[in-house]
Amino acid sequence: MEIELAKSYGFCFGVKRAIKKAEQIKDAATIGPLIHNNEEITRLWKNYNVKTLNDISELSTEQKAIIRTHGITKQDLEKLKQKDIEIFDATCPFVTKPQKICEQMSKEGYEVVIFGDENHPEVKGVRSYVSTKAYVVLDEKELFDIKLPSKIAVVSQTTKKIEKFMEIVNFLMLKVKEVRVFNTICDATFKNQEAINELAKKSDVMVIVGGKNSANTKQLFLIAKNYCEDSYLIENEKEIQKEWFSGKEKCGVSAGASTPDWVIDLVLEKIKEYTKIN
């Protein structure tokens, strides 16, 4: 069986930057997981004593705090600054961008439509910078019954599909007098999605590696599933089942933006081991 890696996969710029920062800082706490990958979070805790807290209120004896790649809310940032603690900001610059846009557009009197999951930490952070009114939606249908203002700015969660973003933008262009559109979907997301789209079309089994709480990884899985019915989302090599590859000729492999190379390598080794048996 042939195994092919997607042309673009794995660690993005923002995640690489955050991991490097955490390894250099050491002996620190992050507010929420630094990235959405349990394997890497465990490695940082064991090797660098970087632990994960659920909330700022859990900070006690820690001397250093790292802000997660997804960012935190404006209000939580203010709370953190009031603590007697050294702060290191690992927010991805691609996430900081929509935060700044929302803050500026609000000052100019625009209400803001955010394409994203309202429960995702990145979206919570971005929304907190809107001082007018924010509408968080996953579909243009959610805007049908809303009385929209004459001025709207539109941003997206960085890991969403560009096609869906455009559907929302097109709807608003027909309904609102003035629409300011900011494409805040990051380049790595676009490249990874494009690559898995291409690979899934020519594979008869797909394995996507990444955190099951990772938005970008789940998006890759959905794209793969659309073209390859036998697509599987796993966090590590232990979840792989050899039956997946029975009678298959080509296995495509991709990974989310928070998935480290060492995890991907273990997955590839396990697939090779199982396909030798077949």
From Swiss-Prot:
<comment type="pathway">
    <text>Isoprenoid biosynthesis; dimethylallyl diphosphate biosynthesis; dimethylallyl diphosphate from (2E)-4-hydroxy-3-methylbutenyl diphosphate: step 1/1.</text>
</comment>
<keyword id="KW-0479">Metal-binding</keyword>
<keyword id="KW-0411">Iron-sulfur</keyword>
<keyword id="KW-0560">Oxidoreductase</keyword>
<dbReference type="GO" id="GO:0046872">
    <property type="term" value="F:metal ion binding"/>
</dbReference>
<feature type="binding site">
    <location>
        <position position="36"/>
    </location>
    <ligand>
        <name>(2E)-4-hydroxy-3-methylbut-2-enyl diphosphate</name>
    </ligand>
</feature>
<feature type="binding site">
    <location>
        <position position="36"/>
    </location>
    <ligand>
        <name>dimethylallyl diphosphate</name>
    </ligand>
</feature>
<feature type="binding site">
    <location>
        <position position="216"/>
    </location>
    <ligand>
        <name>dimethylallyl diphosphate</name>
    </ligand>
</feature>
<feature type="binding site">
    <location>
        <position position="214"/>
    </location>
    <ligand>
        <name>dimethylallyl diphosphate</name>
    </ligand>
</feature>
<dbReference type="GO" id="GO:0019288">
    <property type="term" value="P:isopentenyl diphosphate biosynthetic process, methylerythritol 4-phosphate pathway"/>
</dbReference>
<keyword id="KW-0408">Iron</keyword>
<feature type="binding site">
    <location>
        <position position="258"/>
    </location>
    <ligand>
        <name>dimethylallyl diphosphate</name>
    </ligand>
</feature>
<dbReference type="InterPro" id="IPR003451">
    <property type="entry name" value="LytB/IspH"/>
</dbReference>
<feature type="binding site">
    <location>
        <position position="120"/>
    </location>
    <ligand>
        <name>dimethylallyl diphosphate</name>
    </ligand>
</feature>
<dbReference type="GO" id="GO:0050992">
    <property type="term" value="P:dimethylallyl diphosphate biosynthetic process"/>
</dbReference>
<dbReference type="Pfam" id="PF02401">
    <property type="entry name" value="LYTB"/>
</dbReference>
<protein>
    <recommendedName>
        <fullName>4-hydroxy-3-methylbut-2-enyl diphosphate reductase</fullName>
        <ecNumber>1.17.7.4</ecNumber>
    </recommendedName>
</protein>
<feature type="binding site">
    <location>
        <position position="258"/>
    </location>
    <ligand>
        <name>isopentenyl diphosphate</name>
    </ligand>
</feature>
<feature type="binding site">
    <location>
        <position position="120"/>
    </location>
    <ligand>
        <name>isopentenyl diphosphate</name>
    </ligand>
</feature>
<feature type="binding site">
    <location>
        <position position="186"/>
    </location>
    <ligand>
        <name>[4Fe-4S] cluster</name>
    </ligand>
</feature>
<feature type="binding site">
    <location>
        <position position="120"/>
    </location>
    <ligand>
        <name>(2E)-4-hydroxy-3-methylbut-2-enyl diphosphate</name>
    </ligand>
</feature>
<feature type="binding site">
    <location>
        <position position="70"/>
    </location>
    <ligand>
        <name>isopentenyl diphosphate</name>
    </ligand>
</feature>
<feature type="binding site">
    <location>
        <position position="258"/>
    </location>
    <ligand>
        <name>(2E)-4-hydroxy-3-methylbut-2-enyl diphosphate</name>
    </ligand>
</feature>
<feature type="binding site">
    <location>
        <position position="216"/>
    </location>
    <ligand>
        <name>isopentenyl diphosphate</name>
    </ligand>
</feature>
<feature type="binding site">
    <location>
        <position position="36"/>
    </location>
    <ligand>
        <name>isopentenyl diphosphate</name>
    </ligand>
</feature>
<keyword id="KW-0004">4Fe-4S</keyword>
<keyword id="KW-0414">Isoprene biosynthesis</keyword>
<comment type="similarity">
    <text>Belongs to the IspH family.</text>
</comment>
<dbReference type="GO" id="GO:0051539">
    <property type="term" value="F:4 iron, 4 sulfur cluster binding"/>
</dbReference>
<feature type="binding site">
    <location>
        <position position="216"/>
    </location>
    <ligand>
        <name>(2E)-4-hydroxy-3-methylbut-2-enyl diphosphate</name>
    </ligand>
</feature>
<comment type="pathway">
    <text>Isoprenoid biosynthesis; isopentenyl diphosphate biosynthesis via DXP pathway; isopentenyl diphosphate from 1-deoxy-D-xylulose 5-phosphate: step 6/6.</text>
</comment>
<dbReference type="GO" id="GO:0016114">
    <property type="term" value="P:terpenoid biosynthetic process"/>
</dbReference>
<feature type="binding site">
    <location>
        <position position="12"/>
    </location>
    <ligand>
        <name>[4Fe-4S] cluster</name>
    </ligand>
</feature>
<feature type="binding site">
    <location>
        <position position="214"/>
    </location>
    <ligand>
        <name>(2E)-4-hydroxy-3-methylbut-2-enyl diphosphate</name>
    </ligand>
</feature>
<feature type="active site" description="Proton donor">
    <location>
        <position position="122"/>
    </location>
</feature>
<feature type="binding site">
    <location>
        <position position="158"/>
    </location>
    <ligand>
        <name>(2E)-4-hydroxy-3-methylbut-2-enyl diphosphate</name>
    </ligand>
</feature>
<dbReference type="GO" id="GO:0051745">
    <property type="term" value="F:4-hydroxy-3-methylbut-2-enyl diphosphate reductase activity"/>
</dbReference>
<feature type="binding site">
    <location>
        <position position="70"/>
    </location>
    <ligand>
        <name>dimethylallyl diphosphate</name>
    </ligand>
</feature>
<feature type="binding site">
    <location>
        <position position="92"/>
    </location>
    <ligand>
        <name>[4Fe-4S] cluster</name>
    </ligand>
</feature>
<comment type="function">
    <text>Catalyzes the conversion of 1-hydroxy-2-methyl-2-(E)-butenyl 4-diphosphate (HMBPP) into a mixture of isopentenyl diphosphate (IPP) and dimethylallyl diphosphate (DMAPP). Acts in the terminal step of the DOXP/MEP pathway for isoprenoid precursor biosynthesis.</text>
</comment>
<feature type="binding site">
    <location>
        <position position="70"/>
    </location>
    <ligand>
        <name>(2E)-4-hydroxy-3-methylbut-2-enyl diphosphate</name>
    </ligand>
</feature>
<feature type="binding site">
    <location>
        <position position="214"/>
    </location>
    <ligand>
        <name>isopentenyl diphosphate</name>
    </ligand>
</feature>
